[in-house]
């Protein structure tokens, strides 16, 4: 997808060239497992931007965040209160945080493993804090992660000679109940979670902490106080990206709903909501598989983008009109994108076209992707967004760096149903 910044485009091309052949190999293997090779069936894959695409159009550069993107779609479409939502997806090794305020929030340049990727992705922030994050006491400080106990050997409670982890702290504090877990732990995978083992390991660490505290003339702590201390450190680590996607972008966090999912999300959601001042928490009934559920709800989408390098508004021009050449180019991109979706089986009558301009002030390097506003005044929408995120405006020309079109073929709407009372 051509955009300004050649080096980032080169990195993106490299990622696509490296990953796409592996994806093609997987697709061939997957299809070969069916008697007809899925020739009579439609096969779609989730992309990092939150939309589906036909298998033959799936590219490596659009696959990096496809799993977490499914989770964003899942909570966004099932948490319908007319209020903005913070998504909190806590798993075993990491936590993914995002925000949904009625429109998908995308980023168009990111870095993964030191490689810049210039492709539309849902704005998902990841931190190394999860149920398997290890607990350390170093130089008088409680530390959580970034090292993970993993699935094997896992936390101490897995009975595989593992490491103290967040899961052990939750178990000791009674936030996890062994009776509600299957007996799949231990070397023969036939034993329950080991509460005694977790408490013994945490007691050993508590003794070390109290020994250092006594040397410094500080009071001792109980096992429960130490466990809670580690959880507070983990919670603060996870709160940081939540503030990044909300407060640091000019949004009032207290006006949001917290939607938690993932295998460990429910253990920490209330504590995070309390610290953030959020009064309503959603825990989906499919919390452990919400990313997969969201993929089933996602729309079929495609995008087109190209550089522009045009002036949109002069200094002091509050209501500039979109130059006719840019409007024509946007229409051409929309036609190309619509044709691709129709080739994938979408009906032309259902397609929704979304237009965007990638704008910045003259002399700056801070771009904002602005969706076409109802009144068509891109410049004013850009100024308002810039003011909300950065707290000031500039008396400078507004430049168009890129044109972007997103065409969507909506999936069937969710059918609401009542659950029987417990």
Model region roles, listed by residue range:
Residues 84, 92, 145, 149-152, ...:
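C-terminal, non-catalytic interaction/recognition modules in large multi-subunit enzymes and RNPs
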Residues 6-16, 28-31, 50-85, 107-122, ...:
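Conserved phosphate-binding catalytic cores of ATP/NTP-utilizing and phosphoryl-transfer enzymes
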Residues 86-87, 94-144, 153-155, 283-294:
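Glycine/threonine-rich beta-strand-loop-alpha-helix active-site module
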Residues 1-68, 154-207:
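Gly/Ser/Thr-rich active-site cleft segment
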Residues 36, 48, 100-103, 136-141, ...:
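Short acidic-glycine loop/turn motifs at beta-strand connectors
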Residues 42-44, 62-63, 70, 84-86, ...:
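Structural motif
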């Amino acid at each position: 997808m051509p955009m300004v910044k050649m080096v980032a485009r080169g990195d993106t091309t490299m990622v696509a060239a490296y990953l796409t052949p592996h994806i093609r190999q997987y697709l061939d293997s997957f299809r070969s497992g069916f008697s007809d090779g899925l020739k009579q069936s439609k096969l779609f894959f989730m992309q990092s931007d939150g939309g589906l695409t036909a298998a033959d159009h799936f590219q490596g550069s659009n696959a990096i965040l496809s799993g977490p993107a499914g989770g964003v779609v899942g909570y966004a479409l099932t948490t319908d209160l007319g209020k903005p939502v913070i998504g909190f997806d806590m798993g075993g090794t990491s936590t993914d945080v995002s925000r949904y305020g009625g429109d998908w929030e995308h980023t168009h340049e990111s870095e993964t493993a030191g490689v810049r990727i210039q492709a539309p992705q849902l704005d998902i922030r990841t931190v190394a804090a999860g149920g398997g994050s290890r607990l350390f006491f170093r130089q008088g400080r409680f530390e959580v992660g970034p090292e993970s106990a993993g699935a094997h050997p896992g936390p101490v409670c897995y009975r595989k000679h593992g490491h103290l982890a967040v899961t052990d702290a939750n178990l000791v504090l009674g936030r996890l109940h062994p009776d509600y877990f299957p007996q799949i732990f231990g070397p023969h995978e036939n034993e329950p979670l080991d509460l005694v083992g977790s408490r013994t390991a945490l007691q050993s660490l508590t003794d070390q902490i109290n020994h250092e505290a006594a040397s410094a003339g500080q009071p001792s702590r109980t096992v429960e106080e130490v466990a809670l201390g580690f959880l507070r450190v983990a919670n603060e680590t996870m709160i940081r990206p939540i503030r990044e996607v909300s407060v640091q972008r000019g949004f009032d966090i207290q006006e949001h709903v917290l939607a938690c999912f993932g295998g460990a999300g429910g253990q920490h959601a209330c504590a995070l909501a309390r610290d953030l001042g959020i009064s309503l928490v959603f825990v989906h009934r499919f919390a452990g598989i919400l990313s997969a559920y969201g993929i089933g709800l996602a729309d079929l989408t495609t995008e087109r983008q190209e550089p522009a390098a045009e002036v949109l508004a002069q200094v002091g021009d509050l209501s500039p009109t979109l130059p006719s050449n840019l409007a024509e180019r946007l229409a051409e991109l929309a036609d190309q994108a619509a044709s691709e979706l129709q080739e994938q089986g979408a009906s032309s009558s259902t397609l929704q076209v979304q237009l965007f301009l990638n704008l910045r002030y003259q002399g700056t390097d801070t771009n904002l992707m602005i969706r076409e506003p109802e009144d068509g005044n891109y410049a004013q929408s850009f100024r308002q967004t810039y003011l909300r995120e950065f707290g000031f405006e500039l008396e400078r020309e507004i430049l168009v760096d890129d044109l972007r079109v997103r065409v969507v073929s909506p999936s069937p709407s969710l059918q609401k149903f009542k659950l029987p009372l417990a």
